[in-house]
């Protein structure tokens, strides 16, 4: 019987390691198969709240943030690792650095709607693999439609303040917990893994949760044995 395990993931849509970590976790869950039944819940984290709503040039923003030499070598490594998990990253083709606050509002509502996983994957793929400009309303709505959204409903959320307080409160909560980088994984509200861990690390951590879920015998006395039938 599969053990139910809740996995809370603190992440940002524009974090490449969050996408890589997502793929590595998925690989781990595939390895475990029927040993676990995972409930995955995504939580908001803004890597750069200073980015304006209309976005800014990705290359210029990264050069300003890290310096031209460092950003280029850093992204080459990320592209290589992404390729190893089947993701086609090309940072030179990303049109914009974008604000993700509204995307987190959508993801918060998506959890209540039951399509958070689909929405998260669609947004990550659109940004990193398809490399499209998510600041364009029509484009974003098309992406959301592919994840099971009604365009009108999504637009109403974008035009409103729905889930704004929830997103801000969650981000404050995880900052207070000491989360300073993403992705950040919490297993059954007990164990935490920081960063895009290798799949094997996820497998080992999840198996530890499985082991600890089993009853621990703290005392033994006379009993009937199921195997031998003796009492």
Where are these regions (language model features)?
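C-terminal cap of thioredoxin/glutaredoxin-like
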Residues: 3, 7-11, 20-34, 42, ...
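Cys/His/Pro-rich metal-binding microdomains
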Residues: 16
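Structural alpha/beta surface segment adjacent to cysteine/selenocysteine redox centers
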Residues: 23-127, 224, 229-231
């Amino acid at each position: 019987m599969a053990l139910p395990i809740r996995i809370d993931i603190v992440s940002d849509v524009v974090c490449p390691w969050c996408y890589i970590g997502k793929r590595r976790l998925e690989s781990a869950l595939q390895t475990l198969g029927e040993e676990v039944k995972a409930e995955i819940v995504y939580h908001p984290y803004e890597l750069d709240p200073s980015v304006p709503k209309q976005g800014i040039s990705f290359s210029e923003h990264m050069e300003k943030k890290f310096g031209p030499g460092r950003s280029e070598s850093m992204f080459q490594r990320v592209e290589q690792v992404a390729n190893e998990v089947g993701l086609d990253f090309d940072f030179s083709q990303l049109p914009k650095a974008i604000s993700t606050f509204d995307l987190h509002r959508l993801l918060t509502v998506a959890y209540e709607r039951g399509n958070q996983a689909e929405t998260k994957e669609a947004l990550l793929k659109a940004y990193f693999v398809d490399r499209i400009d998510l600041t364009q309303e029509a484009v974003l709505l098309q992406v959301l439609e592919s994840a099971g959204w009604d365009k009108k409903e999504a637009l109403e959320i974008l035009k409103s303040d729905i889930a704004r307080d929830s997103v801000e409160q969650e981000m404050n909560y995880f900052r207070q917990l000491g989360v300073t980088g993403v992705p950040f994984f919490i297993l059954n509200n007990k164990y935490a893994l920081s960063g895009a861990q290798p799949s094997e690390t996820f497998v080992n951590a999840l198996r530890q949760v499985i082991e600890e879920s089993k009853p621990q015998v703290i005392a033994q006395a006379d009993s009937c044995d199921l195997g031998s039938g003796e009492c």
